[in-house]
Amino acid sequence: MAPGGPFMRIIIGGGGRVGSGLAKALRSEDKEVVLVDNNARVVKNAQGMDILVIYGDVTKRNKFIEAGIDSAEVYVASTDSDELNLLSCALAKHVHAEKTDGKGNLTTICRLRNPHFVEEHKSGKLGQWAGVDHVVHPIDDAIDRLMSGLRSSSLSEVIPFEADAYIVELDVRSEASNVVHRTLRESGAKVEGGLPLIVGLKRDGNQGKVPTADDILLPNDRVAVATAGEASFNRILRILGHEAVDFPEKPKVIIFGASLIGTRLAKAWQRTGASVTVVERDLQLANNMAGSDIGDLPGIEIIHGDHLDKELLSEIEISSMDIAISALDNDHGSIAAVLLAMDMGVERTGLILYDADLVSVVRRMGITFSVDRRRVAIDAMLSRIHSELPGPYAVLSSVPDVVGICLPVTDRVKFVGKTIADAGLPEWCKVAFIQRKNIHDEWETLRPSSSKNLLEGDKLTIFLPPYRVYDLERKFKV
């Protein structure tokens, strides 16, 4: 079983955007949450969340005792400081062991930015000297979301779910004549090839929900759609009333900034066959990238220069680029860089942002797609907290009252060999994907149908209200 059930105690060190967002998500699952922070404003803001809030320093032993570390099952270090997070994880482990006479078990989850510490974790050494069980370093996940989201200007969110499975979030437009003012069942009969699988529905003024076949779609509804393969995005867009534009097979990509994120972005795009140009105004950073293994990769050009220099951008023919992405350390600087690229003719633009509030703002500016790295971090933390589960955990941004979890079909459940229709799954949840290993021992994503049999070893991605997560975990005996 996932640790502790609905009333497990989780202590969060750091109540900034990540810590408070995590606390809110966990309370929606009825978890017992304690938040510790030494910022009076943060503590005051958190007091309306129905959690225990403690003003204090997470490097102080007495604050962990006050937070009830002896009865806690998870400690999450979510401050903006790597060093503080590492130190607090080590202290939390020590105090917990001391208070339980070494008989308890505390899982520690540490948010980190420095890739050196991430490598320490991969080698297994970080757990030995810092007491860290899981590390959250969501840059690669953020890059995956950004690369998928840039395929269309109409998608508000893209969440990868392993084995080429995706959740895409978008609005329903009035032009979607086959689906608006119809039930999902009626729309399925009207749409050639069937209606895409909608797993979340949000209407202004109403709570988000997992829709049933009798729910009606209206213009401006926000929906979350389960699909397999990025090639399916355009079909979803057309059915829901959006214009679909083909994505270039080998795009030309310009990246502003040779930071850690810029470096990872360049590698990721190069692996897809794209040609990549990186512009970096800091000579040392530009030289560092050029002298690294990235500088030797085919299809990557690194230029030392100012990303706001119109003359330079004209010289490198920025108008011929398919995509412009800014990877600067400052959100406002990144926004300025891609807006200039838009003015100079680049149609698709992307950002990885620190400030969640800017995500909707930049969309109104016409920027194609942006990713809130803090939200990606929260999803990663939730996955680690539900560490008994075999796959990702995601909160839908457009439909915040619905979450997606991945659950295993084992020999312990009663519905092995049965169809989805006969499995007796509750009506408040919906299966988005079946993932199954093929003859090559590789995971494949299958579209669920009521007649498809569930086999031992399958993984089901299921969407449901967050307060029902524990109920479903019990049904799957995890």
Segments from the language model and where they lie:
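Cytosolic regulatory regions of ion transport systems
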Residues: M1-V478
